[in-house]
Structure formats: C-alpha cells, structure tokens
Amino acid sequence: MTKAVLTSISQLALKALLYEVSLSPKPGLVDRFDNGAHDDMSFMTFIDSMIALSPFFQAYIETGFAYAKEEPLLLFNRLRQLGQKAEETMFCATQGINTHKGLNFSMALLLGATGAYLARTPHLMTDLGCFSKEDTLAICRLVKSMTAHLIQTDLGHLNTKKEFTYGEQLFVTYGIKGPRGEASEGFTTLTDHALPYFRQMISQNDPETSQLRLLVYLMSIVEDGNLIHRGGIEAWKGVKADMRLLLQQDLSTTDLRLALSSYNQCLINQHLSPGGAADLLALTFYFAFLEKLL
C-alpha cells in the first residue's frame, strides 16, 4: 500500500513535467507547436529526458519517506546525491542537452519533502487526495529546513573559483540565486504567488486557459535566470513588462492564444526563453495535482 501511494505521487511529478511541455503556445519555450528559442532541443528531447528522470522521482519520494526522522541536512545530502545521478542519466538520454537540470533539483527536494511529510501524516497515506493548502505549505517548509545552509555552502565561496557553472555565473554577475534561492526560501514564489493565482484562475476558467494565464503570470513576476543569461537584465525586465500588460488586457482564450503565438516569434527573434518560469509552472502543476485542482 505504501509503495503504491508513493508511486502514484511520483507519477504526479512526471505528469507535471508532461503538462508543462505540452502546454501550447508558450513564448520562447519548447511546446507541441515548435521549439521556441531553442535550436538544440525539441518536444521529443523533453520526452526522452522525462523517461530518464522518472525512476528517480520514485527514488526521491521513497528516500524522503524512509528517512523522515533524519536531520534535514542529512536528508538533503541523500536527495542531492540521487539528484546528481539523475542528472547524469538525463544528460545521457538527451545527448548532453540540458532539458531539466534545475527542475530535477527542485523536484528532488519537493518529492523528498513530500515523502517525509507523508511519513509524519499517515492519514494522507490512507486518504490520498486530501492534500490541502496547509499541506503544501508544510512540504515547502520542510524544503526550507533542508536547504537553510545551501546559499552559503554553494555560493558563499565563489571568489576562490576560476571557472563557474551556469548558475554560479548568474549569482556572481547578477546576484541571481536560481533554484537554490527558491528552495532555501521555501518556494515562496509557489506558495505566495503561483498557487494562489492558479486556485483563483481554475475556479473561473477551463484548465487550459488557467494554465496559459498562469504561465503569463509567472513570466510577469519570476526572477528568470534563463532570460537574464540569454538577454541580460533589460531583456528580462522587458518580458516582465510585456506580460504584465498582457494580463491587464484580460483577453479571451482565443485572443490569448493568438497573443502568445505572436509573442513566441518575438522571443524567438531575440533568442530569449523564460526557462525559469517554465520550471515554476511545472512545480505549480505538481501541487495542483496534489490538491486536486487539476
């Protein structure tokens, strides 16, 4: 019974990734219609990546459940080691293309925290589907406790390094903390912004319209390291401003799709891709599935 419940939740994480890549049109991003601003990956590359990551999603939640009583830092280290193996497997499946590196990191922590939370709240194991807003907050607080050290440990001593990873370079140049920052703050972008917005949207609109509006909303608020890496601070600010204007227009579903298709070409021309917003879109879907919003 326990393994079946954990498996079903790990499959919700996979489903969240599938929903994210399938949602179309998404400006600058890979979707069912085109490859956005990416010339090195396609919809099928994402499918290959997700299949490679899927067994690790199961391992993340089982690890959290099995080691729920461990100190948060020890659980984090277990999850990170698993995550690094998952990353290697992903890169092998995609022939070196980075489809889900940051999202895999976030999912490792959230699935691990979900497993640990389930071990402490056994009623959810027998009545799956009763996840509440409070449960979501508790899971994110667990992630925060696991990652309280993360910024200092990973980014606090970069002055001694000569070569930087993509995420480290963003921090050194712009102070952007990326997925590490989201995790160490308890995913407040999700709990304080994305999920409240989506709960409201899904109560008023059909699922696909709600998902598209959520994407626009995230693009209007997220500190998007991918956009900044590709186009700099001004390009990122420009995208945020454009999306705020789009939200204010309150377009019909048909007109929203047309506007997003047009903006997709705009971002393709500038080689801009809001990958940070896309990752948070998938994470929002994960909790939306847990809370039965979708």
From Swiss-Prot:
Enzyme Commission number(s) from the entry: 2.4.2.52
Keywords assigned by UniProt, alphabetized = ATP-binding, Nucleotide-binding, Transferase
GO BP terms, alphabetized: prosthetic group biosynthetic process
Q: Which Pfam families match?
A: CitG
The GO molecular function terms of this record are: ATP binding; triphosphoribosyl-dephospho-CoA synthase activity
Q: Can you state which reaction this protein catalyses?
A: 3'-dephospho-CoA + ATP = 2'-(5''-triphospho-alpha-D-ribosyl)-3'-dephospho-CoA + adenine
Coiled coil ranges (UniProt) are none
Q: What class of enzyme is it?
A: transferase
The yes or no answer to whether the keyword Nucleotide-binding is present is yes
Q: Identify the InterPro entries for this entry.
A: CitG, TriPribosyl-deP-CoA_syn_CitG
Q: Which family does it belong to?
A: Belongs to the CitG/MdcB family.
What's this protein's name?
A: Probable 2-(5''-triphosphoribosyl)-3'-dephosphocoenzyme-A synthase
